[in-house]
């Protein structure tokens, strides 16, 4: 079973709500630490660590594909069935959350996707991305975690972090990345990286639950993806956070919490 941490809501008014939070690649549940205290005033929170990350102990002999992760999430969420569950996922966690919303056994009441894609639509681009994922996996295995993190931090995707985050926060995120196991990260990339994600675009119109998409203004690629998703998801709202890039929850934590709490409150009013 996946590793998780449960934080019970301090609010009797929202005692039936549960927000499940899934982190991104080369990360773990601690990425959400600064949000827990505030969010727990409005909802119970469950942070779950994906295969190969943090304290997860998924067996290396298993294939960590999306069907496997869905089954693992089913097991965890079975314990929390009494709650009205909204699932949030960032980037890799967002792709996982979207897959779960469409294929999981436990019905969700809402879905929050932060900087996430429904997958790659054409085979040529998919093949290219599988090669990129494989190259990154080899860097992790051969060069090690520090070399990989140094390269990862230089990606244009994260350029806005230097302006939007304090030095202390950037250091905290760096230390979290460096604490990951490079061999297990390599397996995660190969098993459920973007290249190996099923194309979920054709299924988006089947989402019957409310969906909230959060993207940073500077993250043009994912702003474009969000707007295309909004066109086909029946009950969808898109929030473009000013000045932020890909990692909205760490670049503008306050605005992220405002959006999430607002979405949860709307869901509760509609029950």
Where are these regions (language model features)?
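Flexible "cap/lid" loop of the alpha/beta hydrolase fold
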Residues: 102, 109-141, 147
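Catalytic histidine-centered segment of alpha/beta-hydrolase-like enzymes
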Residues: 244-257
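Conserved HGGG/HGGXW glycine-rich cap/lid loop of the alpha/beta-hydrolase fold
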Residues: 5-58
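Short beta-strand/loop motif that positions the catalytic acidic residue
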Residues: 207, 213-215
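Conserved alpha/beta-hydrolase catalytic His-Asp/Glu region
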Residues: 124-127, 142-203
């Amino acid at each position: 079973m996946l590793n998780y941490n449960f934080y019970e809501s301090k609010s009797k008014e929202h005692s039936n709500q549960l927000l499940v939070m899934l982190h991104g690649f080369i990360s773990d549940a601690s990425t959400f630490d600064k949000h827990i205290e505030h969010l727990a005033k409005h909802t119970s929170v469950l942070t779950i660590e994906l295969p190969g990350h943090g304290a997860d102990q998924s067996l290396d002999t298993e294939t960590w594909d999306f069907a496997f992760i869905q089954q693992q999430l089913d097991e965890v969420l079975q314990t929390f069935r009494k709650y009205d569950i909204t699932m949030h996922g960032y980037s890799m966690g967002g792709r996982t959350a979207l897959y779960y919303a469409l294929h999981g056994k436990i019905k969700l009441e809402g879905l929050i996707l932060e900087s996430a894609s429904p997958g790659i639509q054409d085979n040529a681009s998919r093949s290219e991305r599988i090669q990129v994922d494989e190259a990154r996996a080899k860097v992790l295995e051969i060069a090690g975690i520090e070399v990989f993190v140094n390269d990862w931090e230089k990606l244009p995707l994260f350029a806005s972090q230097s302006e939007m985050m304090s030095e202390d926060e950037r250091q905290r995120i760096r230390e979290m990345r460096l604490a990951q196991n490079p061999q297990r990260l390599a397996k995660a990339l190969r098993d459920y990286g973007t290249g190996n994600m099923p194309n979920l675009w054709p299924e988006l119109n089947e989402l019957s639950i409310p969906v909230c998409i959060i993207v940073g203004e500077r993250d043009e690629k994912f702003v474009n993806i969000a707007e295309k998703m909004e066109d086909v998801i029946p009950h969808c709202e898109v929030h473009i956070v000013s000045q932020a890039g890909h990692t909205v929850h760490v670049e503008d934590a306050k605005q992220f919490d405002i959006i999430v709490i607002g979405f949860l409150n709307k869901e509760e009013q509609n029950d």
